Every structure is written in C-alpha cells, then in structure tokens.
Amino acid sequence: MKFKKIAIIGKYPAAIESNEMDSQLIDLIEHLSKKDYELIIEEKTQKKIKITRYQATPLQNIGAEADIAIIVGGDGTMLGVARSLVDDGIPMIGVNSGRFGFLADLNKANMFVSIDQVLNGNYDEDKRLLIETKVYRDEKIIYESFALNDVVIKSGVRLIELEVSINDKFVHTQRSDGIIVSTPTGTTAYALSAGGPILHPQLEALSIVPINPHTLSNRPIAIDAISEIDIKIVQMEEASLSIDGQIKFPLDMRDKIQVTKAKRTISILHPKDYCYFEMLRNKLHWG
C-alpha cells in the first residue's frame, strides 16, 4: 500500500520535557517534508510545536483525511488515537516517548529508518481486535464505547459483588475489588498486574481477570473472543466502568455491562524486523 497523506499526532508524557518532544516532532516533520508526502498535523500538536505551514486537523477528522497516522507518544496516546480513528480504519505507526511502548514500539533513536521502511511498503500489518461495551439500565443502553486494551469494573472503597455470565451461561458470582475484561493487546497492561495471562495479539480470545478477589479460587480465565460476556452488579456501594484506563463512567445497582468483540479492528504497522517476543523480552526484562 502506498501512503500519500500522513497525519502526525504528538503527545507530551509527564516524563518527557516539552522542548525534547517539540524537537522530536519537528525533526520528524522536517524529515518527511523532504519526501513526496502530504502532511497533516493534528491541531493540538500544531499549536504546541508552532509549525503552521501544514494543514491542521482535529483528531476526530484525521481518519477521513489521512492514509496513515504516525503517533509520537506513549501507549496511552496510542489507545486514545485508536479509539478516535476506529471508524475510518487507517493504520498507525507508534513512536515511543513514554515508559513501556508495548503499542508505540518504534525507538525514537532510529525512528527515521523504521518509519521510512514502513512508508516504503516494507512492513508487517498487525491487526488488533477491539471490544465493544454497552451499559444497560432498565433494559436501555445508557452508555457504549470501544476499547483496545480493556474494560474494567471497579469498586470504590468496599468490595463489589458481580455476577458473570458467558453466552447466557452462569459462570460465577464474585466478591472483589472489581473485574477486568481484556483483549490480547490489553493483557500486558492492567490485567497483567492483576495476575492475568499474556495472550498473543493474534489470538481471537479475551481474558477475564478478577481484581483482588475475596475467594482465592477465583482465577483468571481465557475465552473465545466471539463470546458475549454479561456482568451484573449484585451488591455495591460505589463503582465505575473504565475504558482503556482513560474514560470513566459511574455505575448504578441496576446496571448490566455487556462486552463483545467489536466488528472493527485497528492496524498497527511494524518494520519487517519486528518481533513480538523480542519486544516482550525487552519490556518485561526477561532473561
């Protein structure tokens, strides 16, 4: 696939000095401007770096105007951008300026070489499944959203009691601090710290991971991604729903949360020498 219109999206993680990120984005823009590409700069990024000679576009419109998006930031930036671009389906390249870089996997030290490889067609396409979440209250949908990483139902200060069913089959009632429904992508995020398994991103599977369960026999389980997961609130004092750790929605005792595999996917492009297991080994400090 040939890419002509390239969108540049930047984010400023707290760990990165503003002038360092400015320089990184400006260098990337200057590098690409020497080639035969039409550049589009996400409008907040443009205001930050003060380069005005290129088209500025709101994030929500980039998918309709660009062929590909290059994101300079961390995994959180990738998550937010992915949800914004999901309807248009344009692929993404992630340059890591955050902490981990499970999604934004290109190293900023050699980003020009890696980006040029991808833009010249020397890449592997990594399609990631999304999950769709709907909150029902009195049998009406009151909230819905896509997630690339996970959906988390979490209590406030006290335990929450949840009833979990899969494909209309009762699984269990659990008392815990909450529950995580994770995509394979999300299994290296919150679900991993809660004791869940790592699922390869090409698996068509989801994981259900309890958070600090009261009964130690409540263990994480992995299920087919085409399953429908229904979670009912049995008892709570306060609780909320979190989408990718970025969107928070307050829950009520009457609510039922339904999680299913979304029909849409997102695509991350990697250079040909990318290896998922090498990435895990480096990020998780395996031997």
Locations of regions flagged by a protein language model:
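Short glycine-rich anion-binding loops that position phosphate/pyrophosphate groups of nucleotides
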Residues: P13-A14, D75-T77, G98-F100, T185-T187
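ATP/nucleoside-binding phosphotransfer catalytic cores, i.e., glycine-rich phosphate-binding loops
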Residues: I153, I166-F170, L216-G287
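ATP/NTP phosphate-donor binding region
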Residues: M1-I68, G80, A109-D126, V135-E144
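N-terminal glycine-rich "phosphate-gripper" loop used for MgATP/nucleotide binding
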Residues: I71-D75, A82-S84
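Short, acidic/small-residue loops that bind anionic groups at enzyme active sites
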Residues: D88-L106
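Gly/Ser/Thr-rich active-site loops/lids in small-molecule metabolic enzymes
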Residues: H172-S217
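Redox-cofactor binding/interface segments in oxidoreductases and associated redox assembly factors
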Residues: I8, I71, V181
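Catalytic core of DAGKc-family lipid kinases
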Residues: F100-D177
